[in-house]
């Protein structure tokens, strides 16, 4: 018996590193052919999965005999998915997709090094305007191109905390970057994850700190688009973060509980902190 059904060409969900959960509320997701043309707005169900139907170029393909080798005979096409958060929690971005895709969309542009806590979904990256929630660590920087003096738009900042947990942030069009993440759990403080945190007698949350090693990827994406391709951004070449304008490497930083870490290069002449963190492209 022929089984004709309407096939959803795209099902995708988005992962928030900071809250360690999938996010759908407030996101605007649009899908269209990579060659251009109109965009279809995807909708999210109760499961948090965004689906898009009626995509240009797939109207006929969406209806097929799903019991007769549909997926083995269907030809895919190149699409672009654009993601925007009007609330300003996450950076806008885009990513390519071959559609229709069977099952949940698999994002193939892996982070390098892999970020801690990445789940099955397309990652969201915090915008600098995002307010930090309780019990979340924040690392901020204003990234400046050491050669041109311009904003290092789209530069990737990778933080390795206490030699183990790795988290990633991306600079916006003005070079501003914020990494928002759960604090690492101190080995001698196993109940930090409780809500509210339970503090042992004689202990203080504010006393905890972690060493942070920072690295960058930066290849001067120009002109910087409204919806930067996430795969292209994360595949930028390794760059050098400078401790000062003379070219000294950036030293290890310290993240303290309850205090945002703002990373800056140093003025060689005065020894005072500059308003920016210098990054040198390869």
Q: What are these model-predicted stretches?
A:
Residues 1-23, 97-139, 144-150, 169, ...:
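Beta-strand-rich domain onsets/edges
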Residues 9-11, 26-28, 78, 138, ...:
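Exposed beta-strand and adjacent loop surfaces of beta-rich binding modules
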Residues 19-35, 148-162:
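Short, ordered, surface-exposed loop/turn motifs in non-cytosolic proteins
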Residues 34-65, 164-186:
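Short, acidic Ser/Thr/Gly-rich low-complexity loop/linker segments typical of extracellular
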Residues 62-110, 187-236:
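A short, solvent-exposed loop/turn motif at the edges and junctions
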Residues 130-213:
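Long, positively charged binding patches that form subdomain-scale interaction surfaces
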Residues 222-282:
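Hydrophilic extracytoplasmic domains
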């Amino acid at each position: 018996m022929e089984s004709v059904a309407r096939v959803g060409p795209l099902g995708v969900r988005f992962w928030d590193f900071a809250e360690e959960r999938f996010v759908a509320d407030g996101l605007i997701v649009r899908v269209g052919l990579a060659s251009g043309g109109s965009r279809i707005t995807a909708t999210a169900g109760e499961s948090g999965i965004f689906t898009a139907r009626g995509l240009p170029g797939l109207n006929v393909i969406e209806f097929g005999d799903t019991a007769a080798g549909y997926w083995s005979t269907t030809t895919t096409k190149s699409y672009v998915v654009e993601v925007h958060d009007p609330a300003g929690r996450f950076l806008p971005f885009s990513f390519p997709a071959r559609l229709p895709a069977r099952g949940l969309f698999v994002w193939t542009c892996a982070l390098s090094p892999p970020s801690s806590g990445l789940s099955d979904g397309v990652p969201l990256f915090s915008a600098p305007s995002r307010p930090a929630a309780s019990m979340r660590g924040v690392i901020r920087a204003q990234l400046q191109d050491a050669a041109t003096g311009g904003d290092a738009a789209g530069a990737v900042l990778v933080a390795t905390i206490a030699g183990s947990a790795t988290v990633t942030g991306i600079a916006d069009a003005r070079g501003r970057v914020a990494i928002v993440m759960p604090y690492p759990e101190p080995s001698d403080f196993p109940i930090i994850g409780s809500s509210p945190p339970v503090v042992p007698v004689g202990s203080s949350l504010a006393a905890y700190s972690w060493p942070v090693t920072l690295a960058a990827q930066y290849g001067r994406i120009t002109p910087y688009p409204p919806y930067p391709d996430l795969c292209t951004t994360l595949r930028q070449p390794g760059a050098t973060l400078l401790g000062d304008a003379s070219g000294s490497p950036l030293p290890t930083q310290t993240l303290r509980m309850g205090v945002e870490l703002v990373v800056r290069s140093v003025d060689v002449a005065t020894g005072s902190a500059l308003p920016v963190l210098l990054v040198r492209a390869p």
